[in-house]
Amino acid sequence: MDNWNSVRNVSSDRQTSKTSENPPHTSNEYSGKPEFINLSPDLEENLDEKLMSAFPGLEPHVFQHSQSPLSHKDASLLATMPSVASSNPSLISSGSSQTGSPSQSLSSNKEPSSPGISPSNDSQSQNTNHTSISANPYVNNPSHTSRNPDSGSSLNTASHEVPSSKSDVNVQMLARLKSKSRQKISSSDPLEDLRLTLTECLNPINIVQAPKECAAILVNLMSNITQDDQKLVFLDLLKSKVGNSIYSQLVDGGRKLFLPKLRNWFVSAIRSKHDELIHLILLVLANLPLTTEKLAEVKFGKPILIVKKKSTNSVIRQLAENLSELAEKSFTIEQNRENEKSSTKNDSTVSSSAVVMAPAGPAMAPSASNKPSASSTTKSSNSKSKKKVTSISGTSFFKNLASSTKPTSASSSTKAPLTKQQTNPSTPLSSIMAGLKGREKEKDKDSGISSENVSNNREELPSFRKRSSSSRQSEEIASLQAENAVFSSDPASNDEKTGNKKRKKKSVSWKPDNDLVQVKFIESLNEEGAASVKTPHIYGNARDMDRQEARVAFGSHVEDDVENEIIWYKPVPIKFEISKDEIHPRGYKCGGNERNLTPEATSEIEREKNESKDISTFNIILDLPVIREFDDSRPPAHIKLVSSDTQATTELGFNGLVQQVSENNTNAYSATSNSQLSSIFSNLSSSISDASSNVLQNPSLSIPNYSNAI
């Protein structure tokens, strides 16, 4: 608290010294320096109430007056101690408007952001008076923020003077913004960069002094904005009433690109069903000075009517309803223009492919000469030559459209010879079409004129080549003559005057029977018809044949109708005499009780029994005790040790050992046969090992030492 008091005293001393040196201005001229005034607590409270009443849909924290320029602690201190605020004018900054009247505002270092009004909010927000937040030129403008070295906080003060005329506008800042708007947004925080650029551009001073330049900057920014969040920031700052001058420049500016770009955003939002973006665009449209002609130029009426009809949001539908009257009128203008364009296009298409025809009308005397007079160039002239057309047989359709003129007098009743005369190749297509239409009308009225005579009265198609000025004049003359050329309703008089030959009617007639050269008699064969009718179709068609066959096989209809039936006869008896040995000539190697044992099979069985049998399973070996007990009645066995000195001694000792062992075991193995001797000798080594183990277990056994005897 002491630190804050010291800062307060220092700032108040500085302010006192400044005010004493520079007395306040008495005139309405803006000096460019901030003026500090003392705000009483009553004035502060009244200001909050006025702001809350002016903005009923916003939160209290939105107002800059309720935010402290220093910190949250100082803000609470100013709220609880209004006397401190009144005694410290350095904490409160005020900027004057263009008229010189002071306005009180407090702002923090962080610029306040108004909450976006979403379509889901209460409809009461639509009736909110969108008062400009930027009424003070230094609010929401980061370029006017200065740093207080004593308190370390930022205060909103004026950093440049307010221009008194248009020549004093900060040209450098506008040029910088214009060049920046032409570049793509590529910073680390594009939304913040866009917000700062728009805030500088929508500064009231710049809007009033240079609205054209500001509108150009906004249009350039719209060209570089591609993301929906950037569009929301742009429209959110533009929807508030920043000034009628900027709106009129955006709509009626030189390039007039704002409304087309805004329509593209609107159509894109409708397709992606972005309700928030649609809502902001409708709010911007509500502030623009729009007319039906301006909406019709960019075709903005139809999207508004679509949103009004198909939107599911009530707020959006209400905003579209407010603009529906203008939208309907503009849409009507659009349709009328499209109809005019289509009709003009159709007229030009039809006139380019038309053929001139001489219309029927009252007879008119031809002129003495084929050359038209000068008075025949106007529609009011009465002397006009009569133009007659004839058909030439033996040519194609287009070549047959030739016209000829015949100078005949009214009293002559004889037909003049036919002459061929081509029309001027420079006949205009409009006159050709007029002749066609007139000819069709007269043909419907005059039922007496036959179709043959009508088809003969056609002119030749014009050749497409470069036309001269004289040919154009002859075109007009020919068109006027074609309009007034008439034919008599009497076919006879018409033929006499035109000299056309009456074409014979083509008909088909049959000769009598006597004149027929060939007669063909066609008779029907009843047999074939009867046979085809009586043919039974049991299976229906080939597709259902398999199913029909199945029904025949498994149904009551057992007989086969396809095969021919033959008379049954008794078959010849067949005698089968087969011996028992022939039934199984090769025999069975397996098969149970009926197995035929052959000598080979018997020997195989015996071999298999001994092949898989283990030696240790012999009954004789299993019956012998593993360890034989010592018998005192028998003399001990004397086993001579094998000497390694001589071979004879080894052989003698081994034979003697075998002999003694065989003698001692004669009684034990007396029952063995000769076939088992081989197995006994094979187990001799095991018996010797058993004997040695017995000697170790029974100390009474003694092996004599024959070393001395040897």
UniProtKB/Swiss-Prot annotation:
Subunit structure: Component of the cleavage and polyadenylation factor (CPF) complex.
Biased composition (Low complexity): 86-108, 361-383, 401-420
Skewed-composition ranges (Basic and acidic residues): 437-447
Compositionally biased intervals (Polar residues): 1-30, 109-170, 421-430
Keyword RNA-binding attached: yes
Disulfide bonds: none
Protein known as: Cleavage and polyadenylation factor complex subunit C74.02c
Residue ranges of the region described as Disordered: 1-42, 85-170, 361-510
Keyword tags: Cytoplasm, mRNA processing, Nucleus, RNA-binding
Main function: RNA-binding component of the cleavage and polyadenylation factor (CPF) complex, which plays a key role in polyadenylation-dependent pre-mRNA 3'-end formation. Involved in poly(A) site recognition. May be involved in coupling transcription termination and mRNA 3'-end formation.
CC annotations in GO: cytosol; DPS complex; mRNA cleavage and polyadenylation specificity factor complex; nucleus
GO MF terms held by the record: RNA binding
Organism superkingdom: Eukaryota
Keyword Ion transport listed: no
Localization per Swiss-Prot or TrEMBL: Cytoplasm; Nucleus
GO annotation terms (biological process): co-transcriptional mRNA 3'-end processing, cleavage and polyadenylation pathway
